[in-house]
Structure formats: structure tokens, C-alpha cells
Amino acid sequence: MKVAFHTLGCKVNSYESQAMLNMFEESGYEEVDFKEVADVYVVNTCTVTNTGDSKSRQMIRKAIRKNPQATVCVVGCYSQVAPQDIEAIEGVSIILGTQFRNEIVDLVEKYQQTHERIVKVSEVKQLRKFEDLNIDRFLHTRAYLKIQDGCNNFCTYCIIPYARGRVRSRKPESVIKQAKDLVAKGYVEIVLTGIHTAGYGEDLADYSFYDLLVDLVKIEGLKRLRISSIETSQITDEIIDLISKSKIIVDHLHVPLQAGCDETLKRMNRKYNCEQYYEKLSKIRKLVPDIVFTTDVIVGFPGESEEEFEKTYEFIKKVGYTQLHVFPYSMRKGTPAARMVQVDEKIKHERVNRLIALSHELNENYAKSQIGKTLRVLFEKEENGYYVGHGDNYLLVKVPSDKQLIGQLKNVIIDSYDEILIGRVV
């Protein structure tokens, strides 16, 4: 039996797809490319934007056209918040939301016996238990480790709390065990991920995200630990101190901004203002001088005037990120922001382009500042005679080498920059 996956959206979705694939493989299934004929198709959907919804529907229909006799499973955030949309597509066999993924193989076998559509989408508001989806192998050299699910913030633009529910933390012993297993299998870098990653522990009585970091850096053989995303309010003095002293936690933090204007942040229901945000990052830089910051920015949020956008633009330059992830605001039905006055799409598009150009400028300037320095690089692939990988600062680096370097962590002296850093192994 052959199974094919198509995953849309975030790293959490990628993690969950890999976990489901492992379950199928353990049951004797062979993975094939989504473009090929398969017995089972799994589409892991995204609903962060309208584009995510439409792409999800497109991939579902593509699977049905490829093999009308296949078992087509639809899971994830889109099917969680709008299962009726998926039910309207003829040919879908199984519909799950953001729960019950650990039952997917059994549900496929049940469907193949009865050929009766299965819809298993539960209300996530009351969920308080973390669904353990364990993975012991990845296709890449770095391993992702999902430590929590859900979000309690309810930003006015965001549909995700309705798709994922409240914060639910994985049991500490489960996280530590999986981390040790991954290191034992040869992974030297682990990336902590979740819907609101550093919200880990908010639902636990006496164990915090800081406590988890302390336990993880003690794992023998773990060389690099990366936090996929963390809010300024979650960066405690304890965490700053730990990063400054640890050789394991990388000097790179992705700290979502969303807007660099207090008026916009207030409408978004973000839990900080620009001054608080800037002070926290400045405090980190004092203790960790080499740290770099990347961020997310939403452009064209309802009510965003030209003046507000300019404030965001200037604030971004003031902070000095190394990269921006720029998203045009996408109205999500049922969120408070959907009822606000919307920004013209043309204006939104122009502002997005300005910030993307700024991101390229910031990234190039920072990359060139690394020439002559030594970076620690984890090599992930071979390409056109070079080995390519990411530094601790998440910049891409390539080196020529006669020796096989994939999966290895090496010190590299940076010699030049040509859209990517170029260096040589020390």
C-alpha cells in the first residue's frame, strides 16, 4: 500500500505530518510523492490565510483526480474550523481536525472496510490534554520537537486559537525522552516548536519553559538547541541568563513583532508596546552581544494608516533584524479584525513590497558583516560542488569540500558573500 502526503502551513504541521507518516510506515505503507498514484492521500491543511484555505481545497481535489479510488484524508487547521467546507468536496474519505491524528491508520483501515465517510472533528475549546505525536526520524539533519499546542492570546486577526484551542503542554518527561532519542539517532540540532512555543508550561503547576530549557541543555550529545519562536513577554531574565551562558542554545531568536506602531498593536490585541519590545531586545543584546533577531510583520492590518505603516518601517530599522517574514493581512471570518475597516489591497501590496525590500537590505548588510568571522555551521545538503548549511545565526553558508559534511557541525571562516555566505572549514 502506498501513502502520499501534502503539508501546508507551519513547522508544526510539518512535524505532525512526519509523525503520521511514521505511523503509516510502521504499518507497512510505502511513501510516494504526492504527484504519484497512491492508495492513501493525506492533506494536512492550513487556515492562517484565505490562501491557505484555497490551496488546501486545491490539493484535496488534485488527490481525488489523481486516484478517484484512493482513501483521501483531510486533517489540520482548515478542516478543524470549517469541516463543512471539506464535507462539500465529493471524494473525501476521512475528515479530522487538529485531534485524533494518532488514530489515522486505524481510521483508514476502517474506511477501507466500510467505504463510509468518517468525520471526526472535536470542539477544541475545552481540550486540556496534549496529543503526543512522537517522531524518531526526520528527512533533514535538524530535528523538530513539538512541545506544546494551542494559544491563549487571541490576537484580533488570528484564527489559530479557534483551530488549535488553549495552550496544552507536553509532559516534560515525554519531551526529554524524545530529545534523548533524537540525539541517540545522530541529530545534533533540535528545534523546539509549537503553536505558541514558549507558552510551554503555562498550564503546568510547577514546570516552566525555562525549566525545560535547563533540562534539555544537559542532554549529552546535543550540540545545538533552537527556539522556533518566542514572545518578548516570555523572555524572562532567567532565559536571557541561560542563553548568555549556554553553548547549546543558539544566539538567534525569532521574536514576533507584527507591527511597530502602538496604535496598531493595540487594535491587534498584542500584549506589549514598542517601548517594552525594544527595551527587552536591548536587554538581551547587552548580555548576548552576538545575538540576532528575526521577526514576523503583518502589513495592511485594518485601520493601518500611512503614518502607522511608516512608524512600523522606522521601528524595524531601529531594531535591526536580520530577516523579516512579511505577511499581508488576511481577513479571517469570525475574528474581531474582520469587523474592522479594511485596508485597500493595492496599498497593502505596495507596503508588503517595501518591507520585503527592507528585509533583503537588512539581511545582506548583516551577512556582509560576518566576513572574516568564524561561524558554527550545520551542513544539510550538497549543491553544485558545495556543502550548504545554517550557522547558529541562521544564515546560509556554503563551503567547498572533498569530504562528506552532511549532518556535521563545523567551524567555518567566512571569506565572502554572493547571495549566500561562502567560507572554508577550519
Residue map of PLM features:
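Proteins enriched for Cys/Gly/acidic motifs involved in redox and nucleic-acid/cofactor modification
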Residues: 1-199, 214, 253, 275-286, ...
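Residues at alpha-helix caps and immediate loop-helix transition turns in enzyme cores, especially N-
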Residues: 16-17, 52-56, 205-209, 238-239, ...
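Conserved SAM/AdoMet-binding glycine-rich loop
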Residues: 72-73, 81-82, 86, 184-306
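Short flexible coil/turn linkers enriched for glycine and charged/polar residues
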Residues: 138-141, 151-153, 249, 259, ...
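Conserved, mostly hydrophobic/aromatic
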Residues: 155, 175, 192, 227, ...
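A glycine- and small/hydrophobic-rich beta-loop-beta segment
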Residues: 297, 309-312, 318
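Contiguous mid-protein beta-loop-alpha structural module that forms a pocket-lining wall or clamp
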Residues: 304, 320-321
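Terminal RNA-binding accessory module
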Residues: 339-426
